């Protein structure tokens, strides 16, 4: 299964600086999307891009807050795990 951390702290202290879906390697075709409260896509990852999010959008750190993720596993199951992740400074 997947483990989806509920928060991370992208403050470059070497601890929890990125949000990474644990177990995603079992789903090589999965697509990960993260949206802000307004519904704007702020992170997208597929098999050709990094599989973790550092809390930035267009090179700028995003503010504290709750963001919504959606993971299309692309494994034929139709499962699309959804939830929230918080950025905390």
Task: Please report, for each region that a protein language model flagged, where it lies by residue.
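Short loop/turn motifs at secondary-structure boundaries
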Residues: 1-89
